């Protein structure tokens, strides 16, 4: 899906699998992931690789696509990650995003004392970098003149 907008910024996404159920009037987005630790996907991939951002954007892409295709009355189901084991030992698992995880992906969240930025903050940071043509330092560190407080 190319050319959909989130907070004034244009995106494109290439989803692995999309199922349109015309009888139930639903659209389901799937993303395929292969990892060495299927049961630790949440901490070792979803958080570490920021897959929550991908899930959020795929959902927005599916909403835009459905509207363009004349399926605006279809329910866009929350994304699912189909996770397989790279060693082919463990069975695959399906991880389903929830409304809470979508809200976290949008707004950012904390997990085990670590902050994870949301799409809203990231797009704001990107807009700031575009507007100011500053790419070699984060907005936060720029605004504090490069002074970072410890502890």
Regions found by a protein language model. Name each.
Residues 1-40:
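Catalytic cores of nuclease domains that cleave nucleic-acid phosphodiester backbones
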Residues 36, 42-49:
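Conserved helix-adjacent loop modules within structured domains
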Residues 37-41, 89-92:
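Short acidic/His/Gly/Ser-rich catalytic and metal-binding motifs that mark active-site loops
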Residues 47-52, 57-151:
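Metal-dependent nuclease catalytic regions and adjoining charged, substrate-binding loops involved
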């Amino acid at each position: 899906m190319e050319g959909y907008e989130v907070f004034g910024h244009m995106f494109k996404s290439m989803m692995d699998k999309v199922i349109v159920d015309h009888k139930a009037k639903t659209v389901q987005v799937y993303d395929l992931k292969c990892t060495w630790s299927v049961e630790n996907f949440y901490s070792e991939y979803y958080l570490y690789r920021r897959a929550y951002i991908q899930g959020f954007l795929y959902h927005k892409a599916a909403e835009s696509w459905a509207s363009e295709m004349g399926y605006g009355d279809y329910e866009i189901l929350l994304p699912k990650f189909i996770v397989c084991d790279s060693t082919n030992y463990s069975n695959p698992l399906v991880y389903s995003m929830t409304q809470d995880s979508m809200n976290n992906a949008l707004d950012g969240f904390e997990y085990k004392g670590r902050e994870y930025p949301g799409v809203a903050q990231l797009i704001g940071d990107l807009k700031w970098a575009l507007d100011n043509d500053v790419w070699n330092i984060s907005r936060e560190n720029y605004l504090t003149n490069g002074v970072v407080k410890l502890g």
